[in-house]
Amino acid sequence: MASNAELTPMMAQYRRIKSELPKDALLLFRLGDFYEMFFEDAQTGAQLLNVALTKRGIVPMCGIPFHAVNAYVGRLLKAGRKVAICDQMEDARPGQLVKREVTQILSPGTHFDERMLKAERNNFLAAVCPAGRTFGLAFVDLTTGDFMTTEVEGDTEALTELQRLRPAELIYPGEAGGVRDLLLGGRRGAAEERKPLTPAISPSDGGRGTTKPGEEGGQHVGSAATGYGWILNGYDDWVFAPETALFTVREHFKVTSLDGFGLRDRTAAIGAAGAVLHYLTQHLRRDVANLTRI
C-alpha cells in the first residue's frame, strides 16, 4: 500500500477512515454515483462480486452503483463479510475535499434491508458463552428488537437450540477452541467441558465495556462459514467474562440488578447477553436503543 505522502487528499481520507474500522470489514466509500473499494478491499470485493478490478493511478479499485448497493451488500454479507458504508456528508465543491463518514457497519446477523431478509424467520445475531457444561446463549434481531437469552446444559442441547433459531451470525470467546470446533460441527474435549467461565475483566477499561473497535478487547479474532448455515466469529474472551458482561447489560438497561429479568445467578446467560451487546455497540457501532427488554 502506498505511503500517506504518496496519496491524494481523498485517498488519505480513505486510509484514515479504513484504519478506524474493524480489520475484517470491507469499506464501501461513496464517490459520486458509486461506492468504491480500494487496495486489498478492491481485490476481495471484485472477486466476491464478480465485478471489474481496475486502478486509480497505482491503487487497485472496483466500484458498484449507489442505487444497487443493497443487492451488492447482500452478496458480501452472504459470503460472510462485514461491510462498512461510508457516505458523503455534504455536496461536492470544486477543489475541496468532501466530508465523509461511516454511517453503518453491517454484518450477516445485523443486516435489515427488507428485500434481503427472509420474512418467515428472524435474522438473529447470536452469542455463545461456555461455562463448563453450561452454555449461555443470547439472540438479538435488530429488525424487530427481539433480545433473548437462556442457559442450556451440554453440547447437544446447545446445538439443538442454535439450530432451532438458526442465527445468521454467531460470536463466541475466541480462545475457546473447543467451542469453535463444536460450532463448526465437531466436538469439545473433556477438559474444556470442565472449564469454568473465566472471571476476567478488560485490561484496558476495567470491565466497563467501552473499548473502541481496533483496540484491545474489541477485536474480531477469526471467522468461518459453517455447515449449520451461520457465520462464526471469534471475539475477545474478556467481553464474555462475568464482571464485564454484567456491567454491560446493566448499563444498557439502566438498572442496578438483573433479577427483574430472571437472570439472578445466570452467569453464562449474562455473559452471552453482555457479549452480544458489546459486539453490536463497540465492534459494529450500531444503535441498540430498540432493545428494551430481554
Please place each PLM-identified region on the residue numbering.
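A cross-taxon signal for low-complexity, glycine/charged-rich
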Residues: 197-199, 203-210, 215-219, 224
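Charged catalytic and DNA/RNA-contacting regions of genome-maintenance
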Residues: 1-195, 218-294
